[in-house]
Amino acid sequence: MKKLILVASALGTALAMGTMGSALAQKSAADGIAEYRAMLADGNPAELYEAKGEDLWKKKRGPKNASLEQCDLGQGPGVVKGAFVTLPRYFADTKRVQDLESRLVTCMETLQGLNAADIAKTRFGQGEMANVTALATWVASESRGLKFNLSQAHAEEQVMYEVGKRLFFMRGGSHDFSCASCHGEDGKRIRLQDLPNLTKNPGDGIGFAAWPAYRVSNGQMWSMQLRLNDCYRQQRFPYPLFGSDATIALGSYMGVNAKGAENIAPAIKR
């Protein structure tokens, strides 16, 4: 009997130690990634894109030889600070809900005379599309530290949220994935990477509150639309068109859910 008690006690201790070890391993992995990102953020290359974006905002360009300083991002012509954390939102002049990137292209067309359709067809990282990413990076940086608070006052904003929600949970592609497959509940991860639950506020600087971001793995600046396109690629879906209602609706869904989260964009990612 005494031997049985000793064996049971030893097994209990081993199980407890195993559970503690697993918890410590998970915690240390998450902490290690956080420390890695903190070190990388000291001298984030995104600062170069911020500088380029600010210069593009103030520089006279295009057939109309005009700057973007009168661009209305939702807070009034020329007002940049605070705009990013309210987008996507409805704009009366275009009669549609727009995210930051599609709104910037609207301003580039109306104020500078550039061709919006041509920009939309340009590959990410090239030509005027690279300029859109730089502009978005700078605009996002001007709202760093502010809390997300997307409007749902207009009927079109409400529609886009609901469309985004449906798209988020829609399964498809050869792998039968949805956005929710990775980001629909707490506690999911890929390898050492924790996956945020984007059906609610995932926390300051997480998910929607971190993009645009500099990707260390490929040395590129990624906008939110490019990030969503990459998600579609992983789902084995065709890429959405730039400024499509699909990506803007998903942005609306995640942005509204992120209400109260602090913006840290432009962030730095693996």
Which stretches of residues belong to each language-model region?
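Bacterial N-terminal signal peptides
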Residues: A8-G18
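Sec/Tat signal peptide C-region and signal peptidase I cleavage site
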Residues: T19-A25
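Short, charged low-complexity linear segments at domain edges
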Residues: A38-E54, G145-K165
